[in-house]
């Protein structure tokens, strides 16, 4: 449905919606306008609020704030902060997105997570004192939505949705847009949906969705970028795509231009004392009380505006924070993540997952050990044999932290898109497919999204999505498989339970960078592997072409003494199998 249609529906529904009188004589009345239809559980509700008291700065909750207490039928009460916004419209002029500002106002976004009648008690405060009140009753009805992403507490290795549906992430980074702005995401997300991609990563930074970046931004958030993020999150939701939202990145601490000739934003940062902030040095971002207070206010705004999106997978505090450890202290960074993680968890009514990330090839154990960090991440660049990397890192990180693990950035070279080193995209293919066969919570997240789109490399994702459809991937009983016999020049990877397994065999001759320039690798025959730890008896085996995402042949096998012998048909580069106990 188009945004304009949604807006019309909202306006037309307003006369049928509820508006509350003041709760007492000393407070004015807030007018709450919301759609007339009953929302489904996990369907975002937008409430326009008028009657707010005038204030000098609508972004400072110490000056003026809007909050709702929502009492659910179960008796659970959550607090949902409201936010000030400005509407925009967009158009393309000369290949560049141009925004035109529109109406301003206050809004509450709320996500019902159970059916039944919910009572919303809304209040506006001015300098900490109640200035206006309103109440509303909204009934949520059962629907088909699966809920929010959580850690599967049964096995701790995977994600799941609230209704228990297993969640394996098949995606890539799409961190910012180009000159076409949100129009880029219209194209990228359409292609993602067609390819079965269910997960992307966005950054809030100066080039795209950042709201507090420059000298004049302190507590004066950028409404144009906020509107862009609204639109992209809504489009991703419509396309069935989850989003990990990265709130900051290492460039805010850089002073000198980096390898790419930029990313040195500390001289412009609003928390920098040179710009009227409270931080003389970059590390004071993590230790200064005023800086923390400002960041908590920004987090409140972020939660108010975007936590109600059910496709928000996680908040990621920082991208590659240790890129700037020359001017930062790791202990202070960890303490900040602990404290702000607790703060964020406490104000987020949906309790989305939380994480953070380090530079390529780096790991800092004490941060991921924090209970405030729900999953661990690794960025892989310039590493040979991506499937082995994925298997080794997944096993090590899981053994260390007992949390889901993601390779959330991947590339054959951190310096840029280098197709000459991977002309047939085997590294990309192997990084993607290996994620599904090593116990990782998702595929490796390729970094070079614009190049991937222009080269139409989405079939690598769609083939994997087709293979995984209908499997049990993400179930708590599926764990990295073990093989005790390997013959015929293959590397085996897999996940298995006693009665189900997914197996992927990689020809060693094209294990990137080996054989990278070989356009047509020879057909591999005579491979044999033995999968262990399975129930005895008859098994069905489906062999799949991984380039096309299609079944090529079915076979039968018999397990004895917990061992299942697999003999694939002839294949080129790699082949996958779906196995199930009869």
For the regions a language model picked out, list residue spans one by one.
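Bacterial N-terminal signal peptides
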Residues: 8-18
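Boundary at the C-terminal end of the N-terminal hydrophobic targeting segment
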Residues: 19-23
């Amino acid at each position: 449905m188009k945004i304009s249609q949604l807006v019309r529906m909202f306006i037309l529904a307003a006369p049928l919606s509820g508006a509350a009188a003041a709760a007492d004589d000393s407070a004015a009345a807030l007018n709450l306008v919301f759609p007339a239809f009953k929302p489904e559980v996990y369907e975002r509700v937008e409430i326009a609020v008028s009657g707010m008291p005038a204030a000098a700065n609508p972004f400072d909750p110490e000056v003026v704030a809007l909050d709702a207490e929502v009492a659910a039928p179960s008796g659970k009460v959550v607090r949902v902060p409201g936010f000030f916004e400005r509407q925009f419209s967009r158009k393309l002029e000369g290949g560049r997105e141009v925004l035109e500002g529109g109406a301003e106002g206050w809004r509450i976004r709320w996500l019902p997570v159970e059916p039944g009648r919910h009572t919303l008690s809304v209040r506006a405060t001015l300098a900490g004192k109640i200035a206006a009140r309103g109440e509303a009753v909204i009934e949520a009805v059962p629907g088909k939505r699966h809920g929010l992403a959580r850690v599967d507490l049964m096995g701790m290795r995977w994600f799941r949705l609230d209704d228990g549906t297993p969640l394996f992430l098949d995606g890539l980074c799409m961190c910012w847009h180009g000159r076409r702005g949100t129009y880029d995401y219209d194209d990228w997300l359409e292609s993602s949906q067609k390819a079965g991609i269910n997960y992307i990563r966005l950054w809030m930074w100066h080039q795209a969705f950042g709201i507090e970046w420059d000298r004049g931004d302190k507590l004066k958030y950028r409404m144009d970028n906020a509107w862009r993020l609204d639109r992209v999150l809504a489009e991703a939701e419509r396309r069935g795509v989850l989003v990990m939202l990265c709130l900051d990145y290492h460039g805010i601490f850089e002073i000198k231009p980096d390898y790419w000739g930029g990313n040195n934003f500390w001289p412009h940062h609003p928390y920098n004392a040179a710009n009227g902030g409270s931080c003389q040095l970059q590390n004071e971002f993590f230790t200064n009380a005023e800086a923390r207070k400002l960041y908590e206010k920004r987090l409140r705004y972020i939660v108010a505006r975007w936590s109600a999106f059910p496709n928000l997978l996680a908040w990621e505090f920082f991208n590659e924070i240790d890129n700037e450890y020359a001017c930062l202290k790791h202990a202070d960074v960890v303490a900040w993540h602990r404290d702000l993680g607790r703060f964020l968890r406490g104000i987020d009514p949906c309790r989305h997952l939380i994480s953070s990330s380090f530079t390529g090839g780096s790991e800092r154990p004490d941060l991921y050990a924090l209970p405030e960090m729900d999953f661990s991440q690794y960025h892989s660049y310039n590493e040979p044999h991506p499937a082995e990397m994925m298997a080794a890192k997944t096993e090590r990180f899981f053994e260390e932290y007992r949390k889901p693990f993601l390779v959330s950035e991947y590339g054959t070279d951190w310096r840029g898109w280098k197709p000459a080193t991977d002309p047939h995209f085997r590294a990309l293919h192997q990084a993607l497919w290996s994620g599904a066969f090593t116990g990782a919570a998702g595929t490796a997240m390729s970094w070079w999204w614009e190049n991937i789109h222009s080269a139409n490399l989405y079939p690598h994702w769609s083939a994997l999505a087709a293979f995984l459809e209908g499997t049990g991937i993400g179930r708590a009983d599926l764990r990295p498989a073990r093989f005790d016999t390997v013959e015929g020049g293959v590397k085996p990877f897999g996940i298995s339970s006693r009665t189900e397994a997914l197996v992927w065999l990689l020809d060693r001759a094209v294990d990137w960078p080996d054989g990278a320039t070989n356009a047509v690798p020879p057909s591999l025959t005579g491979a044999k592997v033995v999968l262990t730890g399975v129930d005895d008896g008859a098994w069905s085996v489906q062999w799949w072409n991984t380039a096309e995402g299609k079944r090529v042949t079915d076979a039968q096998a018999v397990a004895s003494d917990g061992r299942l012998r697999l003999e694939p048909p002839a294949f080129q580069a790699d082949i996958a199998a779906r196995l199930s106990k009869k």
